[in-house]
A protein has these predicted regions:
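Short hydrophobic targeting helices and cationic amphipathic motifs
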Residues: 10-11, 16-19
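Cyclic nucleotide-binding regulatory module and flanking cytosolic helices
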Residues: 18-50, 105
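Short beta-strand segments in beta-sandwich/barrel cores
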Residues: 50, 59, 77-82, 99, ...
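Glycine- and acidic-residue-biased ligand/ion/polar-headgroup-sensing regions
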Residues: 57, 68, 72-79, 96-97
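Short phosphate-coordinating micro-motif centered on Lys-Gly-acidic
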Residues: 60-65
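Cyclic-nucleotide recognition modules
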Residues: 90-145
Length: 145
C-alpha cells in the first residue's frame, strides 16, 4: 500500500494510474506551449496514450520491423541507431521533452530502418500514429499543429 496524504490510501495500481495522469498532464503542458488544447486533444492523451517506465537498454522499436508508435520522452534518454556492415551507427538522441518515431514506417509504409532504445531508465508515453490521425480528423487544432 502507498500512502497519499494523511488519510487516503491507494493500491500500487491506483498509485501508478495517478503517476500516468501526472505524466500526461506534463505532455499536455508541453503541447499547450504551441496550441490551444481542446477537449478532443485532452481526451486523446488520457485515453489513447500509455505511459511506462522502461529500463536501460530496452528496444522500443527494431530495425526491419513495422512500428507505427510515437514516443514522447517524459524522463530519460532514447537513442536511434541502425546497423550497417555490422557496425552500430547512432543517428540521433532524444532527451526529455522530445518526440520520436520511425517515420519510414509511418509515412512510407516501409520496414523501419532504425532501432530505438532506452540508454537510461526512462518514462515514455506512447501512442499509435493511426490513433493520432483519427484525432486530427476530429480536431482542427491538432490537424493544424
Amino acid at each position: 500500500m502507498f500512502v497519499w496524504g494523511a488519510s487516503e490510501f491507494f493500491s500500487e495500481r491506483s498509485f501508478f494510474v495517478i503517476l500516468q495522469k501526472i505524466n500526461r498532464m506534463r505532455i499536455l503542458q508541453e503541447v499547450e506551449k504551441h496550441i490551444k488544447v481542446d477537449a478532443e486533444i485532452e481526451r486523446f492523451f488520457y485515453e489513447e496514450c500509455e505511459t511506462r517506465t522502461i529500463e536501460k537498454g530496452k528496444l522500443l522499436s527494431e530495425q526491419n520491423h513495422y512500428n507505427r508508435n510515437i514516443y514522447f520522452v517524459e524522463e530519460g534518454m532514447l537513442r536511434m541507431f541502425y546497423y550497417e556492415n555490422g557496425k552500430d551507427i547512432t543517428s540521433n538522441f532524444y532527451s526529455e521533452g522530445k518526440i520520436t518515431a520511425n517515420i519510414d514506417t509511418i509515412f512510407k509504409n516501409e520496414l523501419s530502418k532504425n532501432n530505438i532504445e532506452t540508454i537510461e531508465k526512462s518514462i515514455i508515453t506512447t501512442c499509435n500514429y493511426h490513433k493520432l490521425e483519427e484525432l486530427c480528423s476530429v480536431s482542427l487544432t491538432a490537424a493544424n499543429f
